[in-house]
UniProtKB/Swiss-Prot annotation:
Recorded consequence of changing residue 379 to Y: In swi-t467; lethal during puparium formation
Keywords in alphabetical order: Glycoprotein, Leucine-rich repeat, Repeat, Signal
The organism's place on the tree of life at top rank: Eukaryota
Domain LRRNT: from-to ranges: 361-416
Entry-linked SUPFAM superfamilies: L domain-like
One GO BP: response to ecdysone
Domain LRRCT, first and last residues per copy: 505-554
Name of the protein described by the UniProt record: Protein halfway
Organism for this UniProt entry: Drosophila melanogaster
Length: 611
């Protein structure tokens, strides 16, 4: 009979276990008293242990026919609670087989163990290892986005009464939140680093305790009209990130001599920042303000380099931004895709309503690298416009004006991307080999060299300039000859809209000038607007008026008369033959020779005629 009873209880226990496994959705709500008693030891456990407790729900409970609560087996891999839970289940099963009356006590013990094991408030999981950060972000702290969702969603899932108890218990356990309004938590892996979520007023941060010990703070989803930067909660921070919120203005300034090294206010729809907001932050290395509605960047007035991210601010104005670029040491993050709006009266840029920061930086380089020539003065450099090249990539055109300085040679170095060089009204006699060997001359396509003493343009032969130029101004120089290479190659591709100006140069005119140069000027008259003003130095004529017949005559030579001499000899021979024939006819018919022939002495050959 006893064996039968034990078998019945064993069968009943197996059926209950099978039912619990088949219906895992039946959850057990932990006892608040047990939660308060047992949460403290586990709350201070290693974050990894807290993570495992959160990963598994509490064990479901079933009741037997006598109303006794029997726990279902817990299948878990928790490092902390697995031993206790498994042991309790095994013990309950063993006692049920030996003594049915002991099931209730065993079950109660198992339930207590299960509750205490899983009663810890849902802490944040450990984030994955972050990739190595760039140098400018080495002092920046960013809490992972899932930390906010995990921590505060976990609290929301509990009932109203339990949520209050859990919040108070967690605040006491962490020692950092002495007020229930505090919406901040300490980061699980970074010491002295805190994150706050869903902030609607700064008191949700300032109500936390030990704020003075905080080093890093990341606030997500802050929704306020004005954020006061002078609040003491920011005094001791080295890294402050306020992201993904809705803030209208940043008012006031950070405290004097703030320790802040990294500041990120991205993705907040901010439209205004106090002009002196970061003026007294001497150690600031990174300032991220991307994806807002800002039109101005606050001044720093600091000499230290800073990395700045203004991408995504489509209302940013170019004029004040350009002033900051010139006066402060700033490295822009993603300058190709950071844009600003410029005043339409500017002439730097060509047919666009927005300008990239990269173009503004190029303008600064154009000006700061402008040539300064000892004993002569400084050139004037401007970024006149933007030239669109292949793949829609813009390239700045730096124009260098070194006119009226009295230079005797070209500048040694030009700014990068110099497309126009103006050296008019100087005393330059030679172009030298700059267009061959100096890389800063390779992009020039406009050369203004009027009113100098340049005597030759042979230096252009074989250069990139002769292939890509658009304008050459060489008026009123000392050119004596235009080389044949230049004539054959300078205007081969008229599709580039090339123009050459040579008026005021007095060339050495000769037969070759009349034949080759004159024809070249006539054929390319549309590309040489002042071709009518090119004159000769050795005759008072313009090149276009030269006459080939006059210039191409050869000096007198005896070979020119040989044909006349031959013709005269032929005529003389014919006359002699005619005279001899006539005398012979007279002698035969009249018997005497004409008087001239009778006076001539006899020759040895006369006997031929006397026979």
């Amino acid at each position: 009979m006893l064996a039968y009873t034990h078998g019945t209880w064993l069968l009943l226990l197996l059926l209950l276990v099978a039912g619990a496994c088949a219906r895992p959705e039946i959850a057990h709500t932990p006892d608040p008293a047990a939660l308060g008693e047992e949460s403290t030891p586990h709350a201070h456990a290693h974050p990894q242990a807290r993570h495992h407790h959160h990963a598994h729900p509490h064990a479901p409970l079933k009741e037997d026919e006598q109303g006794t609560a029997i726990p279902a087996p817990i299948l878990t891999t928790d490092n902390v609670g697995i031993g206790e839970t498994t042991t309790a289940s095994s013990l309950a099963e063993t006692q049920s087989m030996s003594d049915p009356g002991s099931v209730t006590d065993t079950t109660s013990t198992s339930t207590s163990h299960s509750t205490s094991t899983t009663s810890t408030t849902s802490p944040a999981p450990l984030p994955p290892a972050a990739p190595e950060q760039p140098e400018y972000l080495k002092h920046c702290f960013y809490a992972e986005e899932q930390l906010c969702g995990h921590t505060f969603d976990g609290r929301a899932e509990t009932s109203e009464g339990q949520g209050s108890t859990v919040a108070q218990s967690e605040a006491q356990n962490r020692g950092g939140q002495g007020n229930s309004q505090c919406q901040c938590r300490e980061h699980p892996t970074r010491p002295n680093s805190w994150y706050c979520c869903n902030i609607s007023q700064l008191t949700m941060i300032s109500s936390c305790s030990n704020i003075s010990k905080w080093t890093n703070l990341h606030v997500r989803n802050m929704t306020v009209e004005d954020m006061d930067l002078s609040n003491p909660i920011f005094r001791s921070l080295q890294s402050l990130a306020v992201t993904d919120g809705n803030i209208t203005r940043l008012v006031n300034a950070f405290p004097r001599l703030s320790a802040l090294k990294c500041l990120n206010i991205s993705n907040n729809n901010i439209s205004e920042i106090h002009s002196r907001a970061v003026k007294d932050v001497p150690h600031l290395e990174f300032f991220g303000m991307s994806n807002n509605n800002l039109s101005l960047v606050p001044h720093r007035n600091q000499n230290k380099n800073i990395t700045l991210d203004i991408s995504g601010n489509m209302r940013m104005l170019c004029t004040p931004l350009n002033e900051i670029i010139y006066t402060e040491s700033i490295n822009f993050l993603n300058p190709k895709h950071s844009y600003c709006q410029y005043n339409a009266t500017h002439t730097w840029f060509q047919s666009t309503d927005k300008v990239s920061v990269e173009q503004l930086e190029n303008r600064k380089r154009c000006v700061t690298n402008c040539p300064v020539i000892p004993n002569y003065g400084s050139c004037n450099c401007t970024l006149e416009n933007i030239m669109i090249i292949q793949d829609n990539q813009s390239k700045p055109q730096c124009h260098v004006d070194c006119s009226n300085l009295g230079l005797v040679e070209l500048p040694q170095r030009l700014p990068d991307n110099t497309f126009m060089l103006n050296i008019t009204n100087n005393k330059i006699t030679s172009l030298g080999d700059y267009f061959h060997t100096n890389p800063t001359y390779h992009n020039i396509n406009r050369l203004l060299a009027d009113n100098n003493q340049i005597s030759s343009i042979y230096e252009f032969e074989g250069t990139k300039f002769i292939e890509t130029f658009q304008r050459i101004y060489m008026r009123n120089n000392s050119l004596s000859k235009i080389p044949e290479y230049f004539l054959n190659n300078a205007l081969m591709d008229s599709g580039l809209g090339r123009r050459i100006y040579l008026a005021g140069n007095k060339l050495q005119c000769d037969c070759n000038s009349a034949k080759t140069l004159q024809n070249w000027l006539k054929e390319r008259s549309s590309d040489i607007p002042d071709y009518m003003e090119i004159r000769c130095r050795n005759m008072p004529q313009r090149v276009i008026e030269l006459q080939e017949a006059k210039l191409c005559q050869s000096p007198p030579d005896w070979t020119d008369y040989i044909y006349y001499l031959i013709a005269a000899e032929v005529l003389l021979l014919l006359a002699l033959i005619t005279k001899v024939s006539y005398d012979y006819w007279v002698f035969k018919t009249a018997g005497y020779l004409p008087w001239p022939a009778s006076k001539m002495p006899k020759l040895p050959c006369d006997w031929l005629c006397e026979s």
